[in-house]
Amino acid sequence: MAGSDLLLAGVLFLFAAVIAVPLASRLGIGAVLGYLLAGIAIGPWGLGFISDVDEILHFSELGVVFLMFIIGLELNPAKLWRLRSSIFGVGAAQVMLSAAILGGLLMTTGFSWQAAVVGGIGLAMSSTAMALQLMREKGMSRSESGQLGFSVLLFQDLAVIPALALVPLLAGSADEHVNWLTVGMKVLAFAGMLIGGRYLLRPVFRFIASSGVREVFTAATLLLVLGSALFMEALGLSMALGTFIAGVLLAESEYRHELEIAIDPFKGLLLGLFFISVGMALNLGVLYTHLLWVAVSVAVLVAVKMLVLYLLARLYGLRSSERMQFAGVLSQGGEFAFVLFSLPASQRLFQHDQMALLLVAVTLSMMTTPLLMKGIDKLLSRRLNPADDTDEAPWVEDDKPQVIIVGFGRFGQVIGRLLMANKMRITVLERDISAVNLMRNYGYKVYFGDATQLELLRSAGAEEAQSIVITCNEPEDTMRLVEMCQQHFPHLHILARARGRVEAHELLQAGVTQFSRETFSSALELGRKALITLGMHPHQAQRAQLHFRRLDMRMLRELMPVHTDTVQVSRVREARRELEEIFQREMQKESRQLDGWDEFE
């Protein structure tokens, strides 16, 4: 595709998305279906603006690649190990059962047994991009059904490898026999990627982050994702699987959240392009000439996969209110069918329009999924009483933070140690890479990044956290964070560090009441000790400290409207006289009472 044609195609994609997606969302059918309809409109069977569908479809697979990298970042090896039974149990059972049933049905419609095997495997796979997008839209990502769905999708990605190797064997081509030496070299190269990634990625990103240039960090992230995808494609393996592994290798690193926000904009655009390309690939000519066959095929495909998934969910022990959602979200055919059916060896297996019919059925099944999920939601809302599942608590991820601490200097470290000592889950954001490396050596969950970026806060768990503690060195950063949290995360309890009275006044004006002036409490404590050394009783010194704290806080609030005005000078003098009078009354009161307690430090 020439440069000018590529630019024109890009403009058409953006225009179609800007028009179709908001309309689809307003109609309540979801963004994914909007992208698919936009693709049909501008594709060769619609208005005909774009005809080179195959090249665009291949390029748009990068959206799935970026999505799998972000999913990998959200899963560490320990969590993957916990999911092993659902990945290799439910996932394997779904692929084998669905492929066997669908392959058998294809044989009854005139497919050879070899073509039926390939067709059954291709149809058994679900759309990773579609399913994960719908899971996020429906809030399933952190539920047990969402985790089980992800396990099934992950096994399907793993199953791509043997499926691609099986097709040449079924085609029976002599020049496509299995070269076991080549297979062995690919396995070694794959192992080398795992080992190299495990020990090299973090030092490389540490070196890049130390430059302090954000654009270079973004470029390095793109290089990692695209390089992993290209490497896996060269091995004949799934590009998405390669980037998923790269994400998992960095899931426990201090750069996890910064990597996620660097990739997220590209992921969203490329995923949209992928769905548009799938819509463009819909062959309406085949649909018109074989309308009944296609309609029955789509219905059977969705019904068989839903039945298999529902039964497996029941055997797995998924609670009743989530089984239908789990089965529905994975009921469609997937993007892997386009890859598998388009192989030269596969094309020799299919006769006449068989491959085109299967691809049309897959595309339409993807288009029906958003509507199916909408219907399932309505059905569940009518038939299920929330009380029906009270005996089964929903699965909730246990490593999401309760508190986010921004800045981990001496001030933030004291807060973090106190919270961790009381078993609170914290996530720390710090933009000084040397401090990040030091604190992670001591076992703190510290991540590199600039917390004044909205997406970094969201990635760090601000939507699930209960509180945020802001301990930035710069007052401007503190106020920017306060404004951002109030606008985008209003549920968060905001606690902030103020360097002095001016910053305290600004926080009060912004509506933040939970703050601490960094030297105030320590100065008061030292002042209390000074009173004791001058002969004052510890109990009396303690009360003096409390009176001073209360009066100072009251003054702070009263002077907030005029904290930049000379009016506050006279008010400060009045407050000092008031404080002296309070202390005089306290002295007289204490002289008539017995000692309360002695200093014990």
Curated annotation (Swiss-Prot):
InterPro entries documented for this protein: Cation/H_exchanger_TM, K/H_exchanger, K_H_efflux_KefB, Na+/solute_symporter_sf, NAD(P)-bd_dom_sf, RCK_N
Function field: Pore-forming subunit of a potassium efflux system that confers protection against electrophiles. Catalyzes K(+)/H(+) antiport.
RCK N-terminal domain boundaries: 400-519
Gene from which the chain derives: kefB
Name of the protein in question: Glutathione-regulated potassium-efflux system protein KefB
Similarity section: Belongs to the monovalent cation:proton antiporter 2 (CPA2) transporter (TC 2.A.37) family. KefB subfamily.
Record bears the keyword Cell membrane: yes
Organism: Klebsiella pneumoniae (strain 342)
Primary location: membrane
